[in-house]
Amino acid sequence: EKDFALVEDALVKEDMFEKRNRLYSSLSGGEKQRVLLARALAQEPTLLLLDEPTNHLDIKYQLDLLSIVKNLQINVLAVLHDIQLACRYSNYLYLMKEGEIVYQGTPKETITPESLQAVYGVQSQVTWTEDQQAMIHYL
């Protein structure tokens, strides 16, 4: 009974409860992504590992999913290629190049024109909003 309640709660969080009776193969890529997250959440993990969890998701669902994950009260290690989303939803970042961590720290400490040049080979200007969101302008 508890397991059913956990699954139901996870599906509701991911806005997938109404599609619970559909075959997995009939879901869109984004819906499949949300079901997989719901499945992981139903296991009540203490550590959640996510590899590109926002792939195939519309912007609204990217924001919804990352907001849910941030509010879980568990440790999350997520691989994200969208720097601005990573800054918005992370307390701590690792920037990697060729499999090595080359920068780490808070988003504001980590995301700088120098780090973006070193890791991605791009020139940029980075400014921060009052609510600590990165605004990156690539030159």
Predicted regions and their residues:
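Conserved ABC ATPase "signature" region
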Residues: 2-19
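Conserved ABC ATPase signature
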Residues: 23-27, 31
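Hydrophobic anchor residue at the start of the ABC signature
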Residues: 37-38, 65
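A short, proline-enriched helix->beta-strand linker immediately N-terminal to the Walker B motif
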Residues: 42-46
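Catalytic Walker B motif of ABC-type/P-loop ATPase nucleotide-binding domains
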Residues: 48-52
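ABC ATPase nucleotide-binding domains
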Residues: 113-139
